[in-house]
Each structure stands twice: as C-alpha cells, then as structure tokens.
C-alpha cells in the first residue's frame, strides 16, 4: 500500500480537505472523486474510507476493546474475535481493562487508527496523527502505520506540518497552501530537493553511470539527459571531476 503525505503549515487547508473526503464537510466548489464515483454517488463508497480527523473520538470510561466493539455494532459487524484482531494490528491487544481516559496520547491515537480500521477500508485518512506526541509516541504511531501498509493492500492519506517525520513514512507527497495544491512529488524527488548533493553535467548519463559504479558511488540519480545528482562523498569533488 502507498502512503501519501499531505504537507502544509497550520491553516493551509489540510483538515478541511480531509473532512470533505470523509464526508464531514461539503465543498463550496469543485468535485470530489473516489473509486470512480463522484457527487451524490460518493455515498456508495464512503464505507471504503476510514478516518481519524483531529482528536480520536473515543469513550473515556470504556476500554479499548469496548470502544472497538461499539464501532463494530454501528457497522453491523458481529464476527467473533474481530475487535481483538483490530487491537492486535495497532499494538493494543494487551492493554486489558484499562480505561481509555488513562491512555497516553500515543495510545489514544493508535486506538483512533484502530477504530478507523473497522470495516476494512481501502483508504485510511489520518489527520496529523503525530501532532503533540512525544518521541516514543511518534515512533509507535509510525510503526503502526508502516505495519498496516505492509500487511494490507491499503492506501494511507496522512497529513502533517512536520516534513521531517513524514519523510520517514510517505512514498508520495502533496504540498498545500491557502487551500491550493501547489505540487505533488515522489519521495525520491523530495529527498533530492532536501539533500546536499553535487550535480554533474555529462554528455551521456548512460556512459557516466558505469564510471560512477566503478568508483564505488552508490547514491546517485539521473535527473535528465545531461545531469546526474550525487549524494555521497561530497568532499571528493576532485575524483568526480
């Protein structure tokens, strides 16, 4: 599964966009299309979308399992062991009868992700799930998302204003500002823009690559028919020349 990182400063429009995708807000103009459906027909595929928008909507005096079971009842799911399976996927299977009001913020976020997984969605929408977490909580949520993508054929749409953290997760990125999508780039393109590098100007990249390989260079990328970006041994410019 792919992880699409939605980047923008606070107030850029990330949450509003995600609320519209989740059916929690209506667009004032334009059109939303998902899974080949648009407009009023979106109701046919809303069940294929799981959302965690802003704070997790959990019952504080219930356990993690009870919260998942409540969501299951709303979805008409009565399969035995289903709630336990969800909790296992988000790393909360062994929290026992601990009330969610006593959970850490990271645990609450993972429970929120678990509740969004009820119904086995094809698209998981996560609105700044690492916002406000300590380093351990960030790592736990990141591991949960990565494990879900590795185990299931699921697309994750995740927003954040922390580019450094999203760079450890996402495979593709969209950059938004003032409600407008400015750019879409791949992870490789993002790393290229953010990394220190030396750009080589060559006549033929296909002839230059074997030379780089022979010299022991591994981290490089062909940009176009006349340029190669090199990301290692930057102080070794004499050898590159």
Regions found by a protein language model. Give the residues of each.
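Helix-to-loop junction immediately C-terminal to a conserved catalytic motif
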Residues: 22
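Conserved ABC transporter NBD signature motif
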Residues: 30-40, 44-45
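Conserved ABC ATPase "signature" region
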Residues: 69, 73, 80-95
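Conserved catalytic motifs of ABC-family nucleotide-binding domains
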Residues: 120
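Catalytic Walker B motif of ABC-type/P-loop ATPase nucleotide-binding domains
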Residues: 124-128
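ABC transporter nucleotide-binding domain
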Residues: 142-232
């Amino acid at each position: 599964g792919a992880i699409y990182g939605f980047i923008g400063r606070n107030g850029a429009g990330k949450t509003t966009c995600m609320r519209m995708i989740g059916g929690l807000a209506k667009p004032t103009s334009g059109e939303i299309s998902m899974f080949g459906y648009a407009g009023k027909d979106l109701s046919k595929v809303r069940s294929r979308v799981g959302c965690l928008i802003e704070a997790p909507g959990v019952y504080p005096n219930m356990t993690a399992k009870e919260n998942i079971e409540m969501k299951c009842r709303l979805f008409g799911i009565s399969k035995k062991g289903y709630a336990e399976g969800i909790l296992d996927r988000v790393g909360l299977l062994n929290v026992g009868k601990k009330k969610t009001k006593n959970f850490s913020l990271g645990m609450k976020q993972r429970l929120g992700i678990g509740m969004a997984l009820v119904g086995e969605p094809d698209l998981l929408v996560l609105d700044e799930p690492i916002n406000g977490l300590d380093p351990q909580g960030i790592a736990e949520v990141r591991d949960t998302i990565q494990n879900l993508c590795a185990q299931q054929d699921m697309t994750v749409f995740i927003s954040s204003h922390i580019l450094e953290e999203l760079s450890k997760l996402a495979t593709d990125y969209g950059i938004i500002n003032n409600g407008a999508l400015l750019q879409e780039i791949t992870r490789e393109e993002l790393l290229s823009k953010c990394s220190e590098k030396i750009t080589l100007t060559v006549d033929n990249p296909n002839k230059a690559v074997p030379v780089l390989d022979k010299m022991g260079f591994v981290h490089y990328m062909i940009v176009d028919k006349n340029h190669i970006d090199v990301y290692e041994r930057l102080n070794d410019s004499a050898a590159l020349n």
